[in-house]
Amino acid sequence: METLSYEKRIELGNLVPALGQFKVMEKIPQYQQCEVHNLVEAPAEVPETLRHVVFNIERGQTLHETIDFLNMCPDLKNMDIIYANELDDGAVRSGNCNVAYEIAKSIGMNYAYGLEFIELVNPEDNKGFHGNALFSRWPIRWAKVVHMPEQYNWYYDRQKRIGARVAIVCSLDIGGREVGAVSVHLENRADSEGREAQMAVVYDEIKRSFAPDTPVMIGGDLNTNTFDGNDIPGFTKLFNDPERLSKHMEHVEQYERVLPQAEENGFSYREFSSIEGTRRKPMPGGKSMLLKLDWLMARGMECVDHGTISTETKDCTWAEPGSALAKFTGPELSDHNACWADCRFAK
């Protein structure tokens, strides 16, 4: 995507208090674009099962190590599609590079990328772009960005930004068959009803874009905290009550409407998603709260197997000697684990 000067970014950001995020986004062509880059040839044959992976990459701050993770992890050797969240393009914190392109090039996949936020804090950012992506070893026929209803205005956050949460809706060509693939990132600074309202827009777009019998997979960080992300005292109290926290994590669907909402729209999530926690939320005292935020949900598909892959450095024992990952001394590649599901088309 074409860059905007830092001065232009600030000029546009200054309009947000008067106009609101969406009116300002209308003035920025990059928000109407969805980049699609088909970089590799399609596989010669369609396997019996396809491996779908959901992974919040946490901006790409450990880019080289993350590329090693994707290339070397035994559970990711035959992945077909990655539903990826939080990828920078031109931000100092991730080396001022295009994270989605670097990953796609290094792991041999096609990709689609959509802009979620323009960061306004750091004048050293070449672009300050931040968004979601979908990686596929199958050709991407088309892709579009879906802007979801605002549930939190990030302009007034310490991470001052222009933008809103997005979904990337893609049509894939898998051996001549159309398959829908949707990468979603819902708002963490919201409650259950806010996230439900965001997903409603995604389901509306799926209905417009695909025939009812087209298989579709949705994957991403749905931020199913089971609490309002703005309620700091509330989730601190939850963290300090292990029995209650365990109940929340065991029965996320009782606290987060997006899960029963999926079933109401013909999508299954129970057999496709991890029963383990997927995100380590930092808490006071160096502790963390393990949450179930990352999900895969599908229609027209059956799950054969699924699992979760730790992104904590201590668990990457399979890293090849001498690689960036093997040399990495940080505690984790991302604050999210990666989740996968092997799926076949329903008969």
Predicted features, each with a name:
Residues 2-44, 87-178:
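Structured beta-strand-rich core segments of catalytic domains in phosphoester-bond hydrolases
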Residues 62, 66, 99, 103, ...:
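Stable alpha-helical elements in mature extracytoplasmic
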Residues 50-57, 70-96, 135, 170, ...:
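Active-site beta-strand/loop signature of hydrolases that rely on acidic residues for catalysis
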Residues 1-38, 208-214, 224-347:
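Metal-dependent phosphoester-hydrolase catalytic domains
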Residues 61-63, 90-93, 120-124, 128-131, ...:
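Short catalytic/ligand-binding loop motif for oxyanion handling, primarily in non-cytosolic enzymes
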Residues 47, 127, 160-164, 287-289, ...:
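A generic structural micro-feature
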Residues 58, 88, 117-118, 185-187, ...:
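Catalytic metal-binding/acid-base residues of hydrolase active sites
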Residues 24, 43, 49-68, 88-92, ...:
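Acidic/histidine-rich helix-loop elements
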